[in-house]
């Protein structure tokens, strides 16, 4: 209501072809949206009937405006581009891959595909209330610091981020649900996005006023969940008169990562977040009457030895608890009997322990609880709804991939490439069954089998095989696909052994310096683990530096080996390959594979490489995912990319039907260049030949990048290189020197190098 009243007082003006002269240059953007005289949005619209009018050309035009008339963008909130059919919007600093469609005109349902995307964006995003809401509550600035290792010059880059449609509607619905849950007599204004009931799931609309359960937001990993939490806190602090926010994670490294995201966005929060190192610090921070954004881990809510009730930290009701990954088992209420041991590790008795959810309620009895999760809540899970309530909003894999919020994940089994005995396979199956239980004695039994399996997986001969295969596989992918890789090892010992085996093959990849080297191990260790392991120990500050290096696509660090770290919450968009050599299942597996689903330039997808036979675990995870209401596959077989590559290869070959290019592969350099020019001339003679050829070769290149180093991809490598060379020639004279071609705008797929 307050937002609507503000809109009435504001003056909104849209101007067509407004002339701007700056530094002697005269430019006329298609549309400028002024609010009280400030140009908050600039729109570049291309003619749908013009075959050269593309989203990319509209984006290039906008880049030209930024260079030639920069003062127009001083107050800019949004840039909008459209080719007449599609329409996308983004912030001033967004690259082309981060320009996103706005899929709902009213926030209650996704718009029909028969309705123009531009019309939907104008109605949904550029209406007066939403535009001002985006300015006030859904815009953040993140600064990243990079240091040139040669010059030691530090560069600070500021990136402006604006909420995508799924974040905007989910957060506003969460605000309404929080108001209801705190006891204020005001319910949700109906589903502000596709209702969870469409997935066969219960939603918060059925919950009573004042139940202190704000609900759960399920947004698939990689779709901006952390930023959604920031937007929520920034707005709820204003809407509910500065409540205290307690953000809870279940691991210290996750706490640090999420805290870092919030700390970067303190302008929106209007306060500086703090971390509570222990229960006493937490109690001290909660002693104030209002305000504060406090970070802590769920493990801090552990009562003293012999106690099964956690002391109350505050009885205030203006406290909102936000839990990241709210589905995890530690939020349970269930009591368990656990053994008590003395210093000699002898059992001397037993005691009752509850799940952390009970202790959390003991500590903050009148708080309101909100959960965020990247994976669905299990159907049989009664703890999560008991603590947080039902779903507020669902944004699953299918929707995220369709929207371009994430990329597809492909799966490749390399089990046949490395030795794992029949004994080892049986041990993995047995271990999986026993680790699924939550009973302590069964977990202890599983530890013994884990030790056995670790010895088999970590045998010197097998480690050498895995290392050799990873080096070959990764180098072949790097030839055609710019990016980085992560190796997941079963134990610290195996992580170090793998590192040593890889370095034996590629000594030049090693460096003792933290800021140098192509490969690093990211882990902690204790002094009792021996010097070989301890030398790879990293402190929090060192891991932060390694994370910055890993996220920087230009840094020489290309591979990291981890055991548990960075498998949840770590966001490196240029990461494209995950090598798994560790038994994993369920939520942990889903979280791990999502490391490679981030959008980066024109990255066609991420690849999960399996050395242990986790296919059955992936199937279970998929079954659980779909049973829980999710749409879309968490992973797709690499064979699908190979099939698409073959299909696109055939299409490109058909375009060159009638032109014999086979002599190219046996010709010398001068004849090769001549054949490329002849092929270019042949393509230009076809009806819309250039456009069709460029589009099909782009599609072929993307499928080829995912398929490599499959043997079928390796067989056609030279042919793909030839087609890419023709495409490069066709595109070469497309743009003036001051403009980038479509292909030069953010590309991660490398042209296959012709060795001749």
Please name every model-derived segment.
Residues 600-700:
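Long, hydrophobic alpha-helical segments
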Residues 266-305:
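Inter-Walker segment of RecA-like/P-loop motor cores
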Residues 449-562, 718, 725-740, 744, ...:
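Conserved C-terminal RecA-like helicase domain
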Residues 332-410, 417-424:
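Post-DEXD/H (motif II) to motif III coupling segment of the RecA-like Helicase ATP-binding lobe
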